[in-house]
Amino acid sequence: LSQPVNLSVTGPFKISSDNINFSNNVQVSSGSSEIFIKFSPTQTGLIVGEILLESPGAESVEVTLTGTGITVVHSYTAFNQQPLGFGGGFNQSASQVFSLHGDMSNIDKVKMFLQIDCPSSGCDDWDRFANVKVKDPASGNWFEIGRYITPYWVGTQQLDRGLEFDVTDFKSYLTGEVELRIYIENWTAKADIVTVEFDFVEGTPDYPYYAVSEVLGYHINSIDGVPYGVDHNFDLDKNIQIPNNTESAHLRTIISGWGHATPNDIGGRPCAEWCFRTHNVKINGSSMFQHYMGPIGCASNPINNQNPGNWQPDRAGWCPGMVVPVRSNDLDLSSTGSSFNFEYDFEDWVSDGAGGNAYYATSTYIVVKSSSQISSPIVTD
């Protein structure tokens, strides 16, 4: 060749003659023998591109390029083999400050994994209420980012990394120096040995800015929840004001029932562990969302080594050895406006006073997102 060579590339590839400046097109002299290629995929899996080489007086040449896009994940260990129990020098909770991922601009998802190992004495015999919280630096309050029920007798080793939670909603709190708290309502000296890890998954976030405020915070333990079937003074009505630059908003609720209050439902199902119910979320006085507290498939739990524990029968919205589901409800901003009234309305039922009390441990958060920096919603009684 006596003429310069023009190169052009397709797909998520860039080319350069100096390994510094990369673009879709480059021209090199006829004597050049080295070209640099940069692969910047925007999706996972096998990706194909092409380089076209052209020079006056010569036939063009096409070179196929292939690359495999993989997801970039930044992993951090928070609590590491932290024992939680009661008596024998153990505590039911532990809190600590950890350094988590700093730059959240290209983080699409945040996953949390929780593994329970057993001490030499074996794990706790019972299924226990348990959760993970992050401290809100502004208020000092603890926000519940995940709840689960421990398995009977065993840990979570049937799962490679234990229980998995999507905590992306709280990513504005899970960056830099973060204070976390773990809790298990374990009343024995058979301590649960807990490890918590976070995966920060790279990708294009739906919105660059998130903010969160707590609406209902009855999540200290299984019987700190809202009493069910009796009169109570728990405040379930709130006013929520969201920032004017909110582009997306949703409610995030975790709810689980406890207790064996009567009268039993058909089939001998007492409340609130076993009784199937449908609760309503009201916006400005109208029922907008329903939370069905029904079966979620306890018998199909992959942590299936919980015998002789009573793990297979379906509870109302939770299972031993499983994550308590998050109930996410998108808000229609065109109808709610920037200020609206919220009410959590439990299905009507009256306890007869026998069988003990019934409780619903309940947490609800308002999550707002925007393309510009956004402040937290204001929640008032």
Q: What would you call each of these model-derived segments?
A:
Residues P12-S16, M112, D381:
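A composition-driven signal for long, intrinsically disordered, charge-rich low-complexity tracts
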Residues L1-T71:
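Feature for long, exposed domains in two main contexts
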